[in-house]
């Protein structure tokens, strides 16, 4: 028996075509591995059957929803991770987990080759292959979409010629990637930057005007940075994301229309829906404003950005990311409390904060009766703080 190919299978166009193509061109058997990351949509058994219909000798489903929420979404919250200050890494954080399970499947099913359906223009090829190199450098990597320069038109034509069941047409050629953390849509008419997204682009979120008269107020509770309750009810990490996806999505929260800088050097337009992710990151960042000392908070903003860049760039297993996470774990020791937010009209508004770990001192902050701030100390502080500027200005005026 020839060496098996272990394919990361999504059920979409590129990986469905890849199963048939690998079998025809290489003669190798394909084991399709589909990872359930809470993406919803089609039943995973239907996805498995499609893989078999396309020619896979085996189709495996891995339920990784809780693992994804706790091991990948949670660090994204702890690092307030928004690439280019906007994108909550919807696809980027899923790739290292998919890599992990593909490597495990390769060991279990006797595969010496792993395959993905990424193009040569995207970031995912890097995320997959750097991940494989980090976890299993002995495995060979096959990337038919990239290495044979498939276009979407060619892939659609191949699928039609070989009766491969897909949910894509030349009239509506969206590329969609989704999981419980969010949804990413690209290609088609969206590649023209002036074209506004149409209603059919969105799935996780309602039009922001639909529930205009019924705003939703929600209280998110945290312990050491981790979401643990919603409106006082205990939740798991996965439950927190799912509930906020539903509630924030109903208010049109989490719609992002982004032109981002890809790792490969080009700019790309992406439409993202991440209602739960944006609420949780917003709430967590707000709680840090209340509980972190100023210099620590300032420095963490730099590490948050760097962590997001590392993950976006496919360096999930890098020593720097590991070191940053050790630092961030220390910062979360006092990040416990509750944040109250109003979800309305596509926006998130924080309107309440409370924490037993708060560094906010009412008696120092108030301008009313009860003020304990010693204002007589301010004059000397201002003088010393501005002394270097004063000396520099005096020199420049000479």
UniProtKB/Swiss-Prot annotation:
Record localization: Cytoplasm
Keywords: Amino-acid biosynthesis, Arginine biosynthesis, ATP-binding, Cytoplasm, Ligase, Nucleotide-binding
GO cellular component: cytoplasm
Coiled coil: none
Major location (coarse): cytoplasm
Keyword match Cell inner membrane: no
Binding site for ATP: 8-16, 117
Record gene name: argG
GO biological process: argininosuccinate metabolic process; L-arginine biosynthetic process; urea cycle
UniProt superkingdom: Bacteria
Pathway, per record: Amino-acid biosynthesis; L-arginine biosynthesis; L-arginine from L-ornithine and carbamoyl phosphate: step 2/3
Amino-acid positions noted as binding L-citrulline in the UniProt annotation, renumbered to this chain: 87, 123, 127, 175, 260, 272
Protein name, as recorded: Argininosuccinate synthase
């Amino acid at each position: 028996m020839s060496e098996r190919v272990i394919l990361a299978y999504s059920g979409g166009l590129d990986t469905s075509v890849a199963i048939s193509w690998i079998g025809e061109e290489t003669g190798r058997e394909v084991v399709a591995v589909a990872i359930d990351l809470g993406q919803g949509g089609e039943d995973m058994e239907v996805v498995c059957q499609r893989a078999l219909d396309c020619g896979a000798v085996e189709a495996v489903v891995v339920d990784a929803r809780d693992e994804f929420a706790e091991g990948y979404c949670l660090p994204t919250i702890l690092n307030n991770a928004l690439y280019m200050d906007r994108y909550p890494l919807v696809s980027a954080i899923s790739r290292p987990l998919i890599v992990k399970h593909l490597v495990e499947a390769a060991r279990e099913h006797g595969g010496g080759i792993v395959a993905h359906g990424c193009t040569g223009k995207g970031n995912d090829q890097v995320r997959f292959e750097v991940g494989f190199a980090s976890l299993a450098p002995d495995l060979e990597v096959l990337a038919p979409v990239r290495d044979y320069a498939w276009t979407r038109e060619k892939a659609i034509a191949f699928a039609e010629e070989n009766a491969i069941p897909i949910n894509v047409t030349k009239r509506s050629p969206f590329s969609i990637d989704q999981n419980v953390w969010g949804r990413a849509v690209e290609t088609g008419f969206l590649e023209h930057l002036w074209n506004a997204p149409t209603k059919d682009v969105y799935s996780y979120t309602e039009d922001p005007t639909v529930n205009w008269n019924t705003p939703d107020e929600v209280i998110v509770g945290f312990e050491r940075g981790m979401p643990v309750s919603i409106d006082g009810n205990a939740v798991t990490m996965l439950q927190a994301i799912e509930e906020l996806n539903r509630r924030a999505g109903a208010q049109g929260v989490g719609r992002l229309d982004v032109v981002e800088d890809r790792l490969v050097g080009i700019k790309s337009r992406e439409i993202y829906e991440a209602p739960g992710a944006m609420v949780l990151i917003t709430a967590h960042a707000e709680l840090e404003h209340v509980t972190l000392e100023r210099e620590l908070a300032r420095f963490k903003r730099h590490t948050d950005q760097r962590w997001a860049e590392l993950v976006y760039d496919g360096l999930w297993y890098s020593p720097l990311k590991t070191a940053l996470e050790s630092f961030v774990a220390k910062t979360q020791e006092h990040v416990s409390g509750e944040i109250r937010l109003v979800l309305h009209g596509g926006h998130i508004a924080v309107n309440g904060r409370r924490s037993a770990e708060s560094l906010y001192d009412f008696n120092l902050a108030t301008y009313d009766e009860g003020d304990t701030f010693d204002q007589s100390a301010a004059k000397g502080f201002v003088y010393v703080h501005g002394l270097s500027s004063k000396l520099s200005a005096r020199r420049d005026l000479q």
